[in-house]
A protein has these predicted regions:
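Cysteine-nucleophile active-site neighborhood
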Residues: 187-262
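Internal gly/pro-rich beta-alpha loop/helix module
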Residues: 11-125
């Protein structure tokens, strides 16, 4: 189902819809829901465009001021859970009113021939993992600085053992764990607070030196470097120092795109989305090759120090046994 913004467009959206329908034969556009529709008469033009483009129109969401979420340099501004729940409830009411849910649900039960592009095997599951893996203790950083996490990754980890969340920003101690997961987020907005967490940083250094498994993505990787500089001429805030690297927001340039990673016979998928840079990325050799969705090799590194694996790419594990990262 394709969601199409109808802002500042009407019937002229037809070529766009037609293009999505025919551009990639492996992608089946089963129906369209329009967003930001200004009026019923506006929707009438959009529905006509769907008919002429040969795609089912499932309905629309009217332009609603209360549903707008502010954005910032790495996407949406994260709001309090309570206000987000209110927003979701409001959106759900509009969906029930303006979207043909019966038609949408009927589409969900159709069989569409397609070609999978992500690693998938119906034979791979939690039961195929090592029995001892189910008893793992897993610590995950989760707070305003570290919160870019695929829900499926959490589900994977939950199947492997018990999860304990901790907060580097608010001064949590490092939980007792067999695996520490430091996801991405906004460490640059909390560099001063993170810099003050000496006890946690010392615990992470000890954990790493003793061979503890750490997986750090993007902002999590930045926390493991020696320093983080937020602005030109500003303080280079000391970070954990596990990786002999330095990160900076100075000269920030957007790096983004889907990534395919080749690492010692494994293939992983994910995405890269950040403005920061490693000052001297070659100070540590990359242990993997990374490619765009079109197969072009990129310079994005994946670092490894003992059992610490870190890089800018946010990994989507799919049905990949992530523990194999430490077996190869």
């Amino acid at each position: 189902v394709l969601i199409v913004s109808a802002r500042s467009t009407a019937y002229s959206v037809a070529p766009l819809i037609y293009g999505f329908k025919h551009f990639n034969p492996a992608v089946k556009i089963a129906g369209i829901v329009f967003n930001q529709v200004s009026s019923p008469s506006h929707f009438a033009y959009l529905r006509e465009a769907c008919v002429d483009a040969g795609v089912e129109c499932l309905g629309y969401l009217p332009m609603t001021e209360g549903l707008k979420i502010p954005s910032r340099h790495l996407g949406l501004t994260l709001t309090a859970k309570r206000s987000m729940n209110t927003l979701i409830e409001q959106a759900a009411e509009l969906v029930e009113k303006y979207v043909d849910l019966d038609k949408l649900l009927s589409i969900c039960h159709r069989n569409f021939p397609c070609r999978y592009t992500l690693p998938y095997s119906s034979e791979i599951g939690v039961e195929s993992f090592a029995p001892s893996a189910k008893k793992m203790k897993i610590a995950i950083a989760r707070d305003p600085a570290f919160n870019f996490i695929y829900r499926e990754n959490i589900d994977r980890l939950s199947a492997l053992g018990s999860i304990t969340y901790f907060s580097p920003v608010y001064g949590s101690d490092l939980p007792d764990a067999d695996l520490v997961y430091l996801p991405g987020g906004y460490p640059e907005l909390f560099a001063r607070q993170l810099h003050r967490r000496k006890k946690l940083m010392e615990a992470l250094r000890t954990y790493a030196e003793e061979g503890g498994k750490i997986l750090a993505e993007c902002g999590g990787m930045m926390f493991l470097t020696r320093s983080l500089t937020v602005r030109q001429g500003g303080t280079a805030y000391a970070m954990t120092g596990i990786l002999p690297l330095d990160c900076t927001m100075v000269g920030a340039r957007l790096h983004l795109g889907y990534r395919r990673i080749e690492y010692k016979g494994m293939e992983l998928r994910g995405h890269e989305f950040h403005y920061s840079n490693v000052v001297a990325p070659d100070a540590m050799p990359s242990v993997a090759k990374q490619f765009t969705a079109r197969g072009m090799e990129v310079s994005t590194p994946l670092y490894r120090y003992k059992n610490v694996i870190a890089g800018y790419t946010h990994l989507y594990w799919g049905e990949t046994d992530i523990l194999k990262l430490w077996e190869v």
